[in-house]
Amino acid sequence: MQGLSFATTFEHTLFLNRGGRFEARALPRASQIAPAFGIAIADFDGDGHEDLFLAQNFSPTDASTMRFDAGAGQLLVGDGRGNFRTLGVLESGIAVVGDGRGAAVADYDADGRVDLAVAQNGAETTLWHNGRGVPGLRVKVNGGVGNPLGIGTQMRIVAGAARGPVREVRAGSGYWSMDGALTVLAMPPGATALWVRWPLGGEQIVPVKPGQREVSISPSAPNR
């Protein structure tokens, strides 16, 4: 019909940036069984590849419509090539059976592993401690006056010719959520430096040592 637009794709879909175009790739079937509101992107297992968490379910439907609440919060581990494997509740340890909404990540206990917080509609917010991931490098950013958290700062680990995924410090992430400003990056064998791009321009290379667990960076002060 003229003037109307119709949706034809309803899967939760990942869009891979192929340089000048995006490639749509539907997430695995287990992540399609319930609507997702919040999404968290982090390296939960510490293998250097980004993983996903989906906060799922929508139960307040009208009397004639079934509830969409078959999810329990879905964790998907990535292989760095755009493929993801779903983990069940017993393997991930995460079970959010209510109506998940916001999801955010942070290393709340400073052990070098990314933890997860999930908000629910009409129920308590849950905190999931990551006790099995490989500890990474904790990066504290001081963006200076007007931007103390360094919002907009991008960074990645350098290991020889290899480069890790780019992370950006953001003021918002997903459904009414904000990840912790401190970033955790996987430290593969041979990691020698942290590449940084500052939000007001300019790039910086910060040396890191094998086994180093934390670094503080600033665009106007020596790194430590």
Model-derived regions, located:
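Gly/Ser/Thr/Pro-enriched helix-cap/hinge segments flanking short amphipathic alpha-helices
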Residues: 4-12, 16-35, 55-224
